[in-house]
Amino acid sequence: MKKQTQSLIICSTILALLVSILILLISMPNSEITDTSTSESVSIPEAFISKKIEDISKIQIKNLENEVNIVANKNEGNIEFTIPELASKNVSKTNVEDFVKEILNMSPIQVVQENVDDLSTYGLNGDVPSISVFDDSGGKVVLKLGAEAPLSMGNYLRINDEHKVYLISPFYAELFKKFNKSII
């Protein structure tokens, strides 16, 4: 009986200690979340294309095999994306719209290097796969896919003719490579 009482007292003490630690942790302000103005290293990457889906007029995808255009047909507030080159095939409209959304949401993992002089280091010289996004106001953003990064971390990417190189995830890199298979 004495041993059971002793075990009960020890367990109760441990439980009380854990509850007090929990209360302390809950009541403490989380400085990492609430004070983001002082932390410059923590940032949420923004999408490369700052347009809404309603503002897009055309997306042109070029890879080493072929070129495909996704055209926005706008009628009374409704948008439907079509692919003229694949008009004879049964293309899923939902898949095409999802593909467009994925392109518009594409964001970098990180900036690899700014002021790059030798683009060949990143596989961004010559003919490379690209995605050009055209908007209704005549604007154009060209995303150029470079070589695969070490350790399969993703691929290098360049925007327009900037001398800045980004790293994108393998998921986004696939949008440049197998677009026609993923849409159908």
Feature-to-residue mapping (PLM):
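A short-motif feature that recognizes glycine-rich, charge-decorated loops
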Residues: M1-I184
